[in-house]
Amino acid sequence: MLKFSFLFLTVEKPGGLFDFDGTLPLIAIQFLILMFLLNILLYTPLLKIIDERSEYIANNLQEASIILNKANELSSQYEKEFSKIKKEVELDSLTLQNLHKNILEIEIISSQKIFENYLNQTINNFDSEKEKILTSLDEEINSLSSEIITKIVA
């Protein structure tokens, strides 16, 4: 018969995979050391960069909100100035329209007076010419009627 004693030497100890001898705590310690090293070497710089970036973004957002507030203030100020200037322009426009209307009325009245003076002068000239012509016709009629009477009587 064969001796199976060498088989007993190679057989695993009882407990197998879940044996709690010195290797499990050693692996746990190695895991904790690795985790600590990874935290120091990788995660801390990464978290530092993330925090810096977050702070940078927060600062930029704060600056942007300040700029936006200033822009809104300037916009409202410009809108107020624009409405004020628009009212002034409308007032100036009305003033200019009234002034133009008054000047036009004055010119029309002046033109009417000139026309009336010219018309009165023309009518007066016409009346004086009419009187001259009527007087001259009256004289001619008198002279012709005297000639006719003298020719009839003669």
Curated annotation (Swiss-Prot):
Compartment(s) of residence: Plastid, Chloroplast thylakoid membrane
Subunit-structure text: F-type ATPases have 2 components, F(1) - the catalytic core - and F(0) - the membrane proton channel. F(1) has five subunits: alpha(3), beta(3), gamma(1), delta(1), epsilon(1). F(0) has four main subunits: a(1), b(1), b'(1) and c(10-14). The alpha and beta chains form an alternating ring which encloses part of the gamma chain. F(1) is attached to F(0) by a central stalk formed by the gamma and epsilon chains, while a peripheral stalk is formed by the delta, b and b' chains.
GO cellular component annotations of the record: chloroplast thylakoid membrane; proton-transporting ATP synthase complex
Keywords for this protein: ATP synthesis, CF(0), Chloroplast, Hydrogen ion transport, Ion transport, Membrane, Plastid, Thylakoid, Transmembrane, Transmembrane helix, Transport
Membrane disposition: Single-pass membrane protein
Biological role: F(1)F(0) ATP synthase produces ATP from ADP in the presence of a proton or sodium gradient. F-type ATPases consist of two structural domains, F(1) containing the extramembraneous catalytic core and F(0) containing the membrane proton channel, linked together by a central stalk and a peripheral stalk. During catalysis, ATP synthesis in the catalytic domain of F(1) is coupled via a rotary mechanism of the central stalk subunits to proton translocation. Component of the F(0) channel, it forms part of the peripheral stalk, linking F(1) to F(0). The b'-subunit is a diverged and duplicated form of b found in plants and photosynthetic bacteria.
Organism: Vaucheria litorea (Yellow-green alga)
GO molecular function list: proton-transporting ATP synthase activity, rotational mechanism; proton-transporting ATPase activity, rotational mechanism
The protein's name in its UniProt record: ATP synthase subunit b', chloroplastic
Miscellaneous field: In plastids the F-type ATPase is also known as CF(1)CF(0).
Pfam family, one: ATP-synt_B
Main localization of the protein described in the UniProt heading: plastid
Similarity comment text for this entry: Belongs to the ATPase B chain family.
InterPro entries: ATP_synth_b, ATP_synth_b/b'su_bac/chlpt, ATP_synthase_B_chain
Keyword Ion transport applies: yes
The UniProt record lists the keyword S-adenosyl-L-methionine: no
